[in-house]
């Protein structure tokens, strides 16, 4: 097969990978835009990660998405790491360059911001504090994005105080750490509220942070998208808040990689959303 006739391959690697909506999303975009290409989900064990990444370009892959548990590990295997991926400490998008180098990026933060801009167009993040629950990889991406858009203060609460303190050390004085027992007490006057934990996800413990102090002018978003309408979003909506579910972040974070791999910037719209939800 010559270079001219090679059909580009992309995919997603993780363990397990069966839950991923990425194949449905990228498959939909390929069909929508009439593009030649394939997007393949692959279960990859940690012990095989280095060998798999080395083999993928030879098999015709132009890049891949990365999900749990490999998002941190691929940083050390990439030749080029973007500043934002280095700051977050994880990558979700790899590009296999023609010169043989692996380029690692993290688009979670831009996906988060784009989701709120699209679904809460009146959102003004610079107008007041943000509350972030959780201190894992998703929280790091969200905090980096919030700082970039000018949030003046980030109130962070996590079930493990040590992880939150470590995150503050990396991101600086805008981040104020609070004990988890205070998670509901830091909501007053916050204009952005984000759950980055797995609380409320199908099969996980319920989200039980009291929301009495919630600012009705806040935009509240939950990165959990299974279920789509989490307890947090239902209660926040009842309190008068604008709510944004987590599916849009998944859709928006995928667009930059698709463009790099297949040459078309895909639209994230209601048709895209419906196609993914139908799978």
Curated annotation (Swiss-Prot):
Q: What is its EC number?
A: 1.1.1.25
Gene3D superfamilies listed in its UniProt record: Leucine Dehydrogenase, chain A, domain 1, NAD(P)-binding Rossmann-like Domain
- Alphabetic keyword roster: Amino-acid biosynthesis, Aromatic amino acid biosynthesis, NADP, Oxidoreductase
Q: Do the record's keywords include Transferase?
A: no
Instruction: Provide the binding site for shikimate.
Output: 20-22, 67, 92, 108, 225
What this protein is reported to do is described as: Involved in the biosynthesis of the chorismate, which leads to the biosynthesis of aromatic amino acids. Catalyzes the reversible NADPH linked reduction of 3-dehydroshikimate (DHSA) to yield shikimate (SA).
Its subunit composition reads:
Homodimer.
Q: What is this protein called?
A: Shikimate dehydrogenase (NADP(+))
Q: Which organism is it from?
A: Cereibacter sphaeroides (strain KD131 / KCTC 12085) (Rhodobacter sphaeroides)
- Gene name linked to the record: aroE
């Amino acid at each position: 097969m010559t270079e001219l006739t090679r059909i580009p391959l992309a995919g997603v690697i993780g363990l397990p990978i069966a839950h991923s909506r990425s194949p449905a999303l990228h498959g939909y975009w390929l069909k929508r835009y009439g593009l030649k290409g394939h997007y393949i989900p692959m279960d990859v064990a940690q012990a095989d990660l280095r060998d798999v990444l080395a083999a993928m370009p030879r098999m015709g892959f132009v890049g891949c998405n990365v999900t749990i548990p490999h998002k941190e590990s691929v940083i050390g295997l990439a030749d080029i790491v973007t500043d934002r991926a280095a700051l977050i400490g994880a990558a979700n998008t790899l590009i296999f360059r023609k010169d043989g180098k692996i380029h690692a990026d993290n688009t979670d933060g831009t996906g988060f911001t784009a989701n709120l801009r699209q679904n809460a167009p009146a959102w003004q993040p610079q107008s007041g504090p943000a509350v972030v629950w959780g201190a894992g990889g998703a929280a790091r991406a969200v905090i980096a994005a919030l700082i970039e858009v000018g949030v003046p203060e980030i109130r962070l609460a996590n079930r493990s105080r040590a992880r939150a303190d470590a995150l503050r050390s990396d991101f600086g004085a805008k981040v104020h750490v609070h004990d988890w027992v205070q998670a509901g007490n830091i909501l007053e006057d916050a204009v952005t509220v984000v759950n980055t934990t797995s609380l409320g996800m199908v099969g996980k413990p319920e989200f039980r942070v009291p929301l009495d102090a919630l600012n009705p002018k806040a935009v509240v978003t939950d990165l959990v998208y299974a279920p789509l309408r989490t307890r947090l979003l239902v209660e926040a909506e009842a309190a008068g808040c604008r709510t944004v579910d987590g599916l849009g972040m998944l859709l928006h974070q995928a667009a930059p990689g698709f463009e790099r791999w297949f040459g078309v910037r895909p639209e994230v719209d209601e048709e895209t959303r419906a196609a993914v939800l139908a799978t």
